[in-house]
Structures are given as structure tokens and as C-alpha cells.
Amino acid sequence: MGDWNKILTDIGRLWDVYGQAYLKGIQNTLILATVATLAGCLIGLLCGVLNTIPYNKNDNIVKRFFLRLIRIVIQVYVEVFRGTPMVLQAVFLYYGLPYFTDNAVKFTNIWVAAIVVVSINTGAYMAESVRGGIISIDPGQTEGAKAIGMTH
């Protein structure tokens, strides 16, 4: 029982010294997660919908070219940002971009860099979720929607 008293006493002392810092850290984490996740959801929704716009041989060559180009860019974005750890993305964006662009692109605020990193990472994951959801719609449902005048 004496060990538990010592542990609880130590936790109490730590809370007295660092309690406000813990609360501020929790607040910052919740703000970052909320803002960046909402931005990432918007990025993912846009990428997922753009990646599933249908086209065929009868469409204009310019439309087909741009839709293919958009799909390639989105697929590269998704593969790169889903395939690399978020810490690596953060280090590259915060330290690598200023180095490689001779300080032309530099984050002056750590919050902006953090929101950008979490947003683009979340956007890549959400893009695949949206794309998968749209593709999984039964063809009969799509035909029914077109029959009543809905578009993609």
C-alpha cells in the first residue's frame, strides 16, 4: 500500500508543477486535430470526387486529357502522402522546403506548418475513402439516379 501512496504523491506533485502545461497541450492538440481534420476532409472529398468523374471515348479529347491528368496527380498525391510517415512529411515541409527553395517557401508559424501537414495527410486518406465509397455504389443505383435526372 505504501508504494501506491508514493506513486499518487508523485503524480500530485507532477500535476502541481506541470498541470497547466498538460491542459494547454490538450487544448492545442484538440484545436490542431479539429481544424486539420476538417481541412483534410474537404481536400479528401474534392480529390475523391474528381478521381471518379466518368469519361469515355466519345468525350472531348481535352476533357479526357484533363481528367486523366487530374487522376494521375491525385493518385501520386495519395500514394506519396499515404505511403510516408507524417513525421517525415512534417520534417520535410518545415525544414526541407526552405532548404530546397532557398527560403522562398518557409513557414514562419509552426501552427500553419502543423495544420498543413495533418491536413494533406488526412486528405490523402479521405480521398481513398471517398473514391472507394463512390466506386462501391451498385451500378443499378447509378442507373436509377441517372433515370431520375441526377448526374455524377
Feature locations, PLM:
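Transmembrane alpha-helices and adjacent helix-loop boundaries
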Residues: 1-152
